[in-house]
Every structure is written in structure tokens, then in C-alpha cells.
Amino acid sequence: MPKKILTGVVTSDKPNKTITVSVERKYSHPVLKKVVKVRKKYNAHDENNKFKTGDTVSIIECKPFSKNKKFQVMDESK
């Protein structure tokens, strides 16, 4: 099974070696017949504390680092 790769914006970099990434996706609502935006937050491992709030990053699924941290930062997206 391939690993998920997601792109989002860093919303928090307060914890050590951890960033919170907000990923936005769009889908067509079956009843409303409108395109709806949904945001979800993921905790990701940032080994060198390199990324700051507002950066756009790509994250990849990996083995769990902790209870809620199951993604790792791949690289910065432009």
C-alpha cells in the first residue's frame, strides 16, 4: 500500500521537533451540489525545527513517532 503524501500550510511550530500542518481538500457535496472545502490538521515530525508558521510543506506517512504523530516532513513546497 503506497504512503500518503499531503501538502499543507504550517499552522504551529511550538512543540520541539513537531509542526502542525493544516491540509485543505475540496469535494462535491452530494445534496448541496456545491464544492465544499474541508481542513484537517496533522502533526508531523520536523527533526531540525526548520519550518516556521506559514510555510507550505509536503508531508509523508511513516511509522508512528508518538500517539498523534504519524507523518514526517518531506520538503518545502513553493
From Swiss-Prot:
Source superkingdom: Bacteria
Annotated keywords: Ribonucleoprotein, Ribosomal protein, RNA-binding, rRNA-binding
GO biological process terms held by the UniProt record: translation
GO function terms (MF aspect): rRNA binding; structural constituent of ribosome
Annotated Pfam families: Ribosomal_S17 (PF00366)
GO cellular component: a single term: cytosolic small ribosomal subunit
InterPro entries with a match to the protein in the record: NA-bd_OB-fold, Ribosomal_uS17, Ribosomal_uS17_bact/chlr
Keyword Transferase: no
Complex formation: Part of the 30S ribosomal subunit.
Protein family: Belongs to the universal ribosomal protein uS17 family.
Function: One of the primary rRNA binding proteins, it binds specifically to the 5'-end of 16S ribosomal RNA.
Protein's recorded name: Small ribosomal subunit protein uS17
Source organism of the structure: Pelagibacter ubique (strain HTCC1062)
Gene for this chain: rpsQ
